[in-house]
A protein has these predicted regions:
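Terminal, contiguous helix-loop blocks that mediate binding/assembly
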Residues: 4-8, 12-22, 26-160, 167, ...
Length: 319
C-alpha cells in the first residue's frame, strides 16, 4: 500500500489540497481512497482565515475540509524577538541587519499581523518562528505525526512527499526551501532512492499579472528568487540553514542542511496558461488541474500509459 503526504504551503498550496480532497470524494464517495492508496495532508499557512475557511471545501453536498491535526498555523510573530535574536538562532542565522531594520521599522503591521504579505523573507521568518515553538502543533511535530499515522496504518515505511506552493507570495515562496530541507533532514534518501521521495508542484508567477491587486511590487521577483534558490539547492551550490537553530558541533554555528544528498526528486512548474494557450482561473480551475495531475500520480494506477512513462523518467530517466 502506497503512502503519500500532500503538503500545501500558503494560499496556492491550500487551494490544491482543497481541489484534491474534492476529487477524491467525487471518485470514491469518501474522504479516503478505497483502492489501497493511503493519503494524508498538511496545510501550512500564515492566514488564520484561509486555514479555517470552509468556503469551496464542499462537493456533492459534503464538506471535505481538513482536520485540525492536518493544519499548521505559522501566524503571529512577537516583535520583541527582534530585540533578542540571540535567543532564536534559527531566525537570526538568515537575517542580516537590513532585514531586521526593514521588519522593525517598515513592516511592523505585517509582522504584527503575522502574515507573509508577499515578502519572502517575512514568510521564512514566520516558518522559522513556528519551528522554534515545538509545542506539538508546529510543522515538524505535525509532519512526524502524519507520517507515523500512515506508516502504522499501512505497515509500510515508504512515504512520498508532495509539496504544493505558489512562488509569487510571501508564505509559500518564503517557506518552500526550508520545508524541503526539514523533510530531508528527518527523512533522508535511502539506498536505491525508493523509500522517501520528494516532489514539488510550483506555481510560477504569470507573465502578465492576472489581477493587478495581487502584485504589491514583489510578485514576479519572488518567483525568480525562489527558483534561483531551488536550482542552487538541486545542484549542490546552496545548503539552507537549519531554521530550527540546531548548531553544528564542529563550527559552533547553525548547521547547514541537505549536504551530500538530493534535496528533491523532481519539480513540476506550471503557470496559469496551458499548452493550448488557454488561461485558467487562479482561484479554482488552475488548482483543480494541478490536483487532477497529482491524483493521477498518486491514487490511480501508474502502471500503463503516459503516467508510467513519467514515473520511468523520474525513477531512472528511461521514460
Amino acid at each position: 500500500m502506497a503512502n503519500h503526504l500532500l503538503i500545501g504551503l500558503g494560499g496556492t498550496g491550500g487551494k490544491v489540497l482543497r481541489e484534491f480532497r474534492k476529487k477524491v470524494y467525487e471518485e470514491f464517495r469518501s474522504n479516503e481512497p478505497t483502492n489501497g492508496t493511503c493519503i494524508n495532508y498538511l496545510y501550512v499557512d500564515s492566514s488564520e482565515d484561509d486555514l479555517n475557511s470552509r468556503e469551496g471545501w464542499k462537493v456533492m453536498g459534503k464538506y471535505v475540509h481538513l482536520k485540525e491535526a492536518q493544519k499548521v498555523s505559522i501566524h503571529g510573530l512577537d516583535m520583541n524577538k527582534f530585540q533578542n535574536l540571540s535567543l532564536y538562532p534559527g531566525i537570526k542565522c538568515f537575517l542580516n541587519s537590513g532585514d531586521i531594520d526593514l521588519m522593525t521599522s517598515k513592516l511592523g503591521p505585517l509582522v504584527t499581523a503575522g502574515i507573509g504579505g508577499q515578502r519572502r523573507r517575512l514568510g521564512r521568518t514566520l516558518f522559522a518562528n513556528n519551528l522554534a515553538s515545538r509545542d506539538g502543533s508546529d510543522f515538524m511535530s505535525r509532519l512526524k505525526q502524519a507520517v507515523q499515522a500512515m506508516q502504522s496504518q499501512t505497515n509500510d515505511q515508504q512515504v512520498t512527499f508532495h509539496i504544493c506552493a505558489g512562488l509569487a507570495g510571501g508564505t509559500g515562496s518564503g517557506s518552500v526551501v526550508d520545508t524541503i530541507a526539514q523533510i530531508r533532514q528527518e527523512y533522508r534518501p535511502q539506498p536505491g532512492g525508493t523509500q522517501y521521495k520528494v516532489y514539488l508542484y510550483l506555481y510560477v508567477p504569470e507573465i502578465n499579472v492576472a489581477n493587478a491587486s495581487h502584485d504589491s511590487g514583489f510578485y514576479q521577483a519572488n518567483g525568480y528568487a525562489a527558483l534561483s534558490e531551488l536550482n542552487a539547492m538541486s545542484v549542490g551550490a546552496y545548503y539552507p540553514y537549519d531554521v530550527t537553530g540546531t548548531m553544528d558541533n564542529v563550527t559552533g554555528q547553525v548547521r547547514r542542511l541537505c549536504e551530500g544528498f538530493e534535496p528533491f526528486d523532481a519539480a513540476f512548474l506550471y503557470s496559469n496558461v496551458d499548452e493550448a494557450g488557454k488561461t485558467l482561473n487562479l482561484a479554482k480551475a488552475l488548482p483543480a488541474s494541478v490536483a487532477d495531475f497529482i491524483f493521477q500520480k498518486t491514487v490511480l494506477s501508474a502502471g500503463t500509459g503516459k503516467m508510467a512513462r513519467l514515473d520511468g523518467c523520474e525513477n531512472d530517466g528511461a521514460g
